[in-house]
């Protein structure tokens, strides 16, 4: 992914299939603190997080809630379960900027907003707006840009609310089939919509998309549904059919089974990203846009949040 800048002669930076061979790895179950006001009969999400960085982290880089230039958060409130992923735009590396820091700070701001008393869990787009405003209005804001995909499951009506800006995204899987899938927002090939805080002296050089441009959706959920949020490192390398074949192999929906399934998805996406002969979704899109690309997968950071909708046993 790149930063879109006005008057740049080339919008695509080629990826070398041999460039990234080592991936750092992190996964985990999420421990939830009890929530006052939450009914013991409300539906809830069993959630795991899995991911890989496309290359080893540099010394001192914080690993918490980051996979390379990707970031994520999960939050639980009395009204809703909330999760989000963000993909820092890699083009900032050429300007000497940590491309993942902006994504990390954006997710941190969004997570903090969920703890405010007026958060009702039904508008992740408003959550994204508030999180971005908090980040961009700091006295010394973090420079950079990222995509963002947020989702909330409101407990009382068991409804999934989403807001997606860029080419990260979400899936809802029911009975082995994709029930809903987000649609990418792009300016051009490999140039997604992105939230941006530009350098103070170069504001006119950047296209700055607004959080209000995020696409919002609403979907009723049922017990047993799977909700998946991921960055483009997954979607650019793994066909939907391959993803479903792994998810449909889950025998149970407990944390251990979900974590095993999420790990298999990430490992397979990593494998495909390094396969120079694989006709990946990214390679297919490049061909559709008449972009010269040697084919194969696209080495990238991969972040995945996988949740199963559950109801308390009586």
Swiss-Prot record:
The keyword Magnesium is annotated on this UniProt entry: yes
Enzyme class: hydrolase
Gene field: fig
UniProt cross-references to SUPFAM superfamilies, sorted A to Z: PP2C-like
InterPro entries tied to this protein: PPM-type-like_dom_sf (IPR036457), PPM-type_phosphatase-like_dom (IPR001932), PPTC7 (IPR039123)
Protein's UniProt name: Protein phosphatase PTC7 homolog fig
Binding positions (Mn(2+) 2): 87, 232
Domain PPM-type phosphatase: 43-309
Biological process terms in GO annotation: dephosphorylation
Binding site for Mn(2+) 1: 87-88
Alphabetized PANTHER family for the sequence: PROTEIN PHOSPHATASE 2C, PROTEIN PHOSPHATASE PTC7 HOMOLOG
Keywords: Hydrolase, Magnesium, Manganese, Metal-binding, Protein phosphatase
Catalytic activity reported: O-phospho-L-seryl-[protein] + H2O = L-seryl-[protein] + phosphate; O-phospho-L-threonyl-[protein] + H2O = L-threonyl-[protein] + phosphate
Essential cofactor(s): Mg(2+); Mn(2+)
Assigned EC number: 3.1.3.16
Any GO molecular function: metal ion binding
UniProt similarity note: Belongs to the PP2C family.
CDD domains the UniProt entry points to: PP2Cc
GO cellular component, one term: mitochondrion
Organism: Drosophila simulans (Fruit fly)
């Amino acid at each position: 992914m790149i930063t879109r800048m006005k008057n740049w002669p080339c919008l695509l930076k080629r990826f070398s299939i041999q460039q990234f061979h080592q991936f750092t790895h992190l996964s985990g179950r999420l421990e939830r603190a009890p929530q006052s006001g939450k009914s013991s009969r409300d539906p809830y999400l069993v959630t795991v997080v899995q991911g890989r960085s496309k290359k080893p982290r540099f010394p001192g880089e914080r690993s918490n809630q980051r996979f390379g230039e990707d970031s994520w958060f999960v939050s639980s409130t009395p009204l809703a379960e909330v999760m989000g992923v963000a993909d820092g735009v890699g083009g900032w590396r050429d300007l000497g900027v940590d491309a993942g820091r902006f994504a990390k700070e954006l997710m941190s701001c969004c997570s903090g907003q969920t703890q405010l008393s007026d958060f009702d869990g039904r508008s992740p787009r408003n959550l994204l707006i508030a999180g971005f405003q908090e980040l961009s209005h700091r006295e010394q804001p973090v420079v950079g840009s990222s995509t963002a995909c947020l989702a909330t499951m409101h407990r009382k009506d068991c409804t999934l609310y989403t807001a997606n800006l860029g080419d990260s995204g979400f899936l809802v899987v029911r009975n082995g089939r994709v029930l809903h899938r987000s649609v990418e927002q792009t300016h051009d090939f490999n140039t997604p919509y992105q939230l941006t805080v530009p350098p103070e002296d170069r504001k006119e050089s950047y296209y700055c998309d607004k959080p209000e441009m995020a696409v919002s959706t609403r979907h009723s959920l049922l017990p047993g549904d799977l909700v998946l949020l991921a960055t483009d490192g997954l979607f650019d390398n793994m066909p939907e059919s391959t993803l479903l074949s792994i998810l449909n192999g889950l025998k149970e929906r407990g944390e251990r089974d979900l974590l095993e399934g999420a790990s298999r998805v990430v490992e397979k996406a990593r494998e495909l990203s390094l396969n120079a002969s694989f006709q990946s979704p990214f390679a297919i899109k490049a061909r559709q846009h008449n972009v010269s690309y040697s084919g194969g997968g696209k080495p990238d950071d991969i972040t995945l949040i996988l949740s199963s909708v559950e109801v308390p046993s009586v």
